[in-house]
Amino acid sequence: MDFINSYEDANRAAAYSTLQFANTYFLAYRDLPAIIAHHVAGKRALDFGCGTGRSTRFLQALGFDVIGVDISEDMVRLARDTDPSGDYRLIPGDDFTGLGVGNFDLVLSAFTFDNVPGGLKGRIISDLGKLLTPKGAIISIVSSPEIYTHEWASFSTKDFPENASAKSGDVVRIIVTDHHDRRPVEDILCTDDTYQEIFANAGLNAIQTLRPLATRSESYTWSNETTVAPWVIYVLKRAS
């Protein structure tokens, strides 16, 4: 199956701009303030793959001076419309020229690598590592392989039984149910073993790996989130 970047689409961007920090998405962000406070000292941040600016505004609320970057013109336009005072930049592919080597205390990547195919992941992660200050950190939130084989408060995969036999690098499909655009999103499955190999080749260490689970005390109607982690959060630092 050929891969299509589902988010280079004006209608998809408009739907994506309505997403909040609710349901399954809540678990991706719930623990970030504590994770960031533990691993990040400075306040200069890059939101890589900022989309319509949801994660960028999240970092702003934590006191960061943030630049949001994305390859989608529609996404960046909507981010600027929502947050006119924010710094949102359209970048061509994986060209980080102008962002500054060693300039960022934090690089956040929320779900971006789900849509990055093949060997491009490794090159981008390596280049992002070069943007870090000596003690800086990359925090990368990615979909767990299990997200593509279960039902969730924010997603459905029941129409795609072929996901169950997918291997790392294969195209998988999922439907976001938290907005009105119910067209399937195509992602690239990537296992933990593959990510760990990519990190090592990029000269980065995964110093913490988290798989957040929901609790029954939270004010959402969970499907599988209390027993199966939909997300994996990697905290990466330069190898010494």
PLM region descriptions:
Residues 138-197:
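SAM-dependent methyltransferase
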Residues 122-134:
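A short glycine-rich, Lys/Arg-flanked "PGG" loop and its adjoining helix->strand segment in the class I
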Residues 46, 52-96:
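Class I SAM-dependent methyltransferase SAM/SAH-binding core
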Residues 98-107:
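A short acidic, Gly/Pro-enriched loop at the edge of an enzyme's catalytic core
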Residues 106-120:
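A short SAM/SAH-binding and catalytic strip from SAM-dependent methyltransferases
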Residues 1-40, 54, 58:
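Conserved class I S-adenosyl-L-methionine
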Residues 42-44:
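Nucleotide donor/acceptor-binding cores
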Residues 202-240:
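C-terminal lobe and adjacent flexible extensions of AdoMet/dcAdoMet transferase-like proteins
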